[in-house]
Curated annotation (Swiss-Prot):
Family to which this protein belongs: Belongs to the universal ribosomal protein uL14 family.
CDD domains the UniProt entry points to: Ribosomal_uL14
Keywords: Ribonucleoprotein, Ribosomal protein, RNA-binding, rRNA-binding
Pfam families registered for this protein in UniProt: Ribosomal_L14
NCBIfam families: rplN_bact
Protein name: Large ribosomal subunit protein uL14
One GO MF term attached to the UniProt entry: structural constituent of ribosome
Protein role: Binds to 23S rRNA. Forms part of two intersubunit bridges in the 70S ribosome.
Subunit structure: Part of the 50S ribosomal subunit. Forms a cluster with proteins L3 and L19. In the 70S ribosome, L14 and L19 interact and together make contacts with the 16S rRNA in bridges B5 and B8.
Single biological process term from Gene Ontology: translation
Parts of the chain that traverse the membrane: none
Length: 134
């Protein structure tokens, strides 16, 4: 579960290394880019949810700089995800992929496994870039 002030690793090559969640937004992609409706009153973000985050640590000469405010989709959480078949999956660390306003990743690679729930939320580009989908 990700809430404001939570720090996340970045799972892409956009140049950022660490993010801090500022706000939990909607969940998923609509017909034309991100769904409208603002943030609502969600307290926690789970896998596949979109957050607004601040870049806390960045690599030099990257696409994003430290201090930038970006949108990101959560791809891994250390809190267990319960699935419809009764199984659960959890990851070692929280991680996110930085996206643009159309919901496409800003980086060209995704590092580490991602959860299968991203496919249900229509983040197909992230799923196709990931080396493993669990």
């Amino acid at each position: 579960m990700i809430m404001p002030q939570t720090r996340l690793d970045v799972a892409d090559n956009s140049g950022a290394r660490e993010l801090m969640c500022i706000r939990v937004l909607n969940s998923g992609i609509g017909g034309k880019g991100l769904t409208k409706g603002g943030g609502g009153n969600k307290r926690y973000a789970h896998v596949g949810d979109i957050i607004v985050a601040s870049v806390k640590d960045a690599a030099p000469r990257g696409a994003v700089k430290a201090g930038d405010v970006v949108k990101a989709v959560v791809v891994r959480t250390s809190h267990a995800i319960k699935r419809a078949d009764g199984s659960t999956i959890r990851f070692d660390k929280n991680a996110a992929v930085i996206i643009n306003n159309q919901g496409e990743p800003r980086g060209t690679r995704v590092f580490g496994p991602v959860a299968r729930e991203l496919r249900d939320r229509r983040f197909m580009k992230i799923v196709s870039l990931a080396p493993e989908v669990l």
